[in-house]
Amino acid sequence: MIGGGSWATAIIKMLSNNIREKEIFWWMRNMDAIEHIKKYHHNPNYLSAAEVNIPAANISDNICEIIHAANYIILNVPAAFLKDTLKAVNPEDFKGKKIVSAIKGIVPDENQIIAEFLHEKFAVPFEDILVISGPCHAEEVALEKLSYITIASIDVEAATYFASLLNTRYLKTNVSDDIFGTEYAAVLKNIYAVASGICHGVGYGDNFQAVLISNAIREINRFVDAVHPISRDIKESAYLGDLLVTAYSQFSRNRTFGNMIGKGYTVKSAQLEMNMIAEGYYAASCMHVINKKYKVDMPISRAVYAVLYEKHAPQMEMALLTEKLS
């Protein structure tokens, strides 16, 4: 496991239900957190009620040491920090391993989803890349509330095996071969959750939210069909379900961020007060650039970009958006 946040902690908790703790290796950069976990068996900063009984020797701030010890490498840091996290890693370190992305984001500056970034920068074959996605907040996993996730990979056999490591009485898994659609849908839903929050912040109610999200899933469908035109059911939980929970949930940091923007916070002040990464902020800029190539009609995504990066007034931009929805 590469990452020390709430989703990383939740996945560690799930894995420890199915495999021996001594087979789990965990990297994080925070030495104080590492020492705390070694001594008290819980993460002091995220999901602190979740017990993690990994041997002390298996938790380290040496990323290459952790990667060399494992066959499946789970990347679980904010997309904006991925390049820096992997700066000591060489393509040879990933050779022969399955790389699992639990990152629902896009790499800034590169404007690439995680699978594309790994393939181009680390020569990881697409067949060796897996994606974890779906409507699954870490907070509810920690509380053992029933949740569903999707494991996507071109190598369906590997996805099925990895899914079996996560299956518990409170977590059900699905398997898909659509890594590109799954990743792009996960990136886009963060933008639409920001839009949902902005609309709530400026005073729109549930009726409009329903229209907004209905249009958002159509935008996702249009875009993923343009990028990777295969047969897929956009109503599956990896697409529609993930959008719904991110747009509506109290745990959604992207909705929270958008709500603050709608209420008049600047981007910087909202980020400082949240003290967490809202992936939708970075995704809005990246998708704006990517869509210059595909030219898909995406008025909601464009409106979020206008508010966050062109400093358009949220109230005015959302009012303009209402004329483009149906």
Segments the model singles out, each with a brief description of its role:
Residues 68-69, 188, 240:
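Alpha-helix C-terminal capping/helix-to-coil transition sites in glycosyltransferase folds
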Residues 54, 58-68, 72-144, 162-164:
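Rossmann-like NAD(P)(H) cofactor-binding subdomain of soluble oxidoreductases
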Residues 81, 92, 120-128, 146-233:
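Internal alpha-helical scaffold of NAD(P)-dependent oxidoreductase catalytic cores
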